[in-house]
From Swiss-Prot:
EC number(s) from the headed UniProt entry: 2.3.1.-
SUPFAM superfamilies recorded: Acyl-CoA N-acyltransferases (Nat)
PROSITE patterns attached to this UniProt entry: GNAT
Gene3D superfamilies listed in its UniProt record: 3.40.630.30
Cystine crosslinks: none
UniProt keyword Transferase present: yes
InterPro entries listed in its UniProt record: Acyl_CoA_acyltransferase, GNAT_dom, N-acetyltransferase
Keyword Ubl conjugation belongs to the record: no
Signal sequence segment: none
Domain N-acetyltransferase: 8-167
Protein name: Uncharacterized N-acetyltransferase YnaD
């Protein structure tokens, strides 16, 4: 994957990216809504290695002007060949600047135009207001609420379920 927007580049991971990934994935505030929790350096290296090549599900988001990795986009097959899930995690230094929306919008375009997808979904915890604001901003609608569906330690998290169809995106 290689997608360019006005300010961003979305590409495949390179091993050298692990340090930038570790910078934000080691932050408990960033990772509080991610079931895997806070990353160690080894977790960050494994994450980057796992997401290289044809089976990648996560892609770095690069700020073009600074050639700086500012977060990553999640994009993978959710159901059949026609439905993918999208998500995002960003370094707190680059949050609230429209980067997540810009990257997500580019992924929607890629999914619908290049991959001929029918549907793209996204999920988040109800407390993760910034994430579902991005979902709304890119045209997704809330389709559901799943009670206690994601295990996190000894707890269960609730989730909102958002989606957009190709015909709604156009």
């Amino acid at each position: 994957m290689h997608i360019t927007t006005k300010r961003l580049l979305i590409r495949e991971f390179e091993f050298k990216d692990w340090q930038a990934v570790y910078e934000y994935t080691s932050d408990s505030n960033v990772m509080k809504y991610i079931p895997e929790g806070v990353f160690t350096e080894e977790d960050a290296k494994a994450f980057v290695n796992k997401n290289k090549g044809d089976n990648a599900e996560k892609f770095p988001v690069i700020l073009r002007d600074e050639d700086c990795l500012i977060g990553h986009i999640v994009f993978y097959k959710y159901f059949g060949e026609h439905t993918y899930e999208i998500g995002w995690v960003f370094n707190p230094n680059y949050q609230n600047k429209g980067y997540a929306s810009e990257a997500a919008q580019a992924i929607l375009e890629y999914g619908f135009k290049e991959m001929n997808l029918h549907r793209i979904i996204a999920t988040c915890q109800p407390e993760n207001i910034p994430s579902y604001r991005v979902m709304k901003k890119i045209g997704m609608r809330r389709e559901g609420f799943f009670k206690k569906c994601i295990p996190k330690g000894n707890e269960w998290w609730d989730e909102y379920y958002y989606a957009i169809l190709e015909e709604e995106w156009n």
